Amino acid sequence: MKRIFQLLLVVIATVCMQAETRPVALFYMTDTPDSVRSFLAHSSKIGILVPTWYSVDATGLVTGGPNPAVLELAQKQHLPVMPIIANAGKDALHTLLANGTAQKAMIAALVRESKLQGYMGIQFDFEDISWTDRDTLSAMTKLTADAMHAEGLQLSIATVPNAPGYAGKGGFAKWIYEDWRGAYDLQALAQSVDLICLMTYDQHTRWTPPGPVAGWDWTVENLDYALKFVPKEKLSLGIPLYGYHWFAGSPVMREDPATKKLEYHPNISANYISTEDALLLAREYKGVAQWDAADHTAWFFIYRDQMREWVFYTNTRTFEDRYKLAQERAIEGFCSWVLGTEDSGIWELLPDRK
């Protein structure tokens, strides 16, 4: 009985420790000055730093390297660093996935660089993948994870959300499943990697009509779908920090498929925008900040050149609702793209790293 009681205390203590450290705050960082400055200012709030430092081509050649100042500060603060390795396009990744020799070269380079630089591990950020490469992506991920684990390193992967697990009816839904969402076998990937970062953002982009970067129901649906296949302790919820600004772009000259004549065509555009720039735009053109209660997101519209333009962005309230969702679902953490675009108020919500 005494031993059972002792084991029970150990289990309770372990659960309490996990609760104290979750959700782990994973932040992405690019090499832009704004992104690096944000990291330098808020490093104590970050649980894992994921910088965009590496890429791989069709031959398995890994290129890139760390920002020395960023890496030095992270190491001084004992902040885990897990850089991204990104693919060089759909065709290059397809070739890599079919070439065992190239994969071995990539894996050896990742292990070597991780040990040399003192990284926690590496994150795969492979996007724009054909759904027909689903199995080979899972296989390469397993090979890489096995090699990393053998050296005491970790492998994570960023995945495009893919609920409900099949293509929709419309042409756009079919295209985005074939070329973006369908390549990720969450169950197979979860068996190999240490963490899956669910990229629950870019619901609406330049490819779509104006709308939230990550609407509430869409976010919840994709999170719950992922939880069917991924253990909670291996799942991180994507929370965007940025927004989009939709406007009427300059008409473009293209050949009409029917007449074969060059004609002007519409060019509705959507530009990536930081929260700071969004608020500046609203002030300049007298936009009134709105709150969409259904989608838990901030937005406004302005008039410029007599045309209505739309902005959906992430303010502190938008971030907080999704942060609380990660807490309520008791998942490992959240992953936010990207430092330098955030509302400064989010940092008041986050505890210091333990």
Language model regions located:
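Short, acidic/polar
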Residues: M29-S43, A98-K115, Y177-L189, Y313-Q327
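Sec-dependent N-terminal signal peptides
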Residues: I4-V15
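Aromatic-lined substrate-binding rim segments of carbohydrate-active enzymes
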Residues: D57-A86, I129-A158, D217, S344
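Substrate-binding surface in catalytic domains of secreted glycosidases
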Residues: S130-A278
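Glycan-binding loop/region signatures in secreted carbohydrate-active enzymes
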Residues: G243-K324, I346, K354
